[in-house]
Amino acid sequence: MASTNSFDVVSDFDRQEVVNTIDQALRDINTRYDLKDTKTTIELGENTITINTASDFTLDAVQTILVTKAVKRNLSPKLFDYGEAESASGGRVRQVITLRQGISKDDAKKITKMVKTDFKKVQASIQGDAVRISSKSKDDLQAVMQAVRDLDFPMPIQFTNYR
């Protein structure tokens, strides 16, 4: 029985968890004394979060709250790609946060190159925005998982479809 085992390396997030994170953050912002009267809004777009608040100080506080709530809901802080803070109407501050999803071609090439050079008995192939890793040995696959975790990528990495 020489069957091959495999798994996929992906960068994805649960949209419902992001919605829950934003709801919890808004609830926290509306009850905090220093942020209560700032009329802060957090809006979720297709792949973006828009924060509209009173000042740079409150923007930093809202970012901290958002990341804290995300971590409590098992979302990686690497999920958020912060854009520039820009001034909005009425002396307010707006910031657009892009939600990272999918592995870029360059990062996928880094993963496959690392696998092919460090692990001779393991195959890696790029499949869209995921990387499929396959081998006959489950131990080799677990070693590859640890090696990929040790590489520092700007996006959150998950392992799915483990067979």
Swiss-Prot record:
CDD domains: YajQ_like
Entry keyword Glycoprotein: no
Coiled coil: none
UniProt entry tagged with the keyword Metal-binding: no
Xref: InterPro entries: DUF520 (IPR007551), UPF0234-like_C (IPR035571), UPF0234_N (IPR035570), YajQ-like_sf (IPR036183)
One of the record's GO molecular function terms: nucleotide binding
Gene Ontology terms: cellular component: cytosol
Listed NCBIfam families: PRK05412.1
Protein's recorded name: Nucleotide-binding protein SYNPCC7002_A1983
Organism, scientific name: Picosynechococcus sp. (strain ATCC 27264 / PCC 7002 / PR-6) (Agmenellum quadruplicatum)
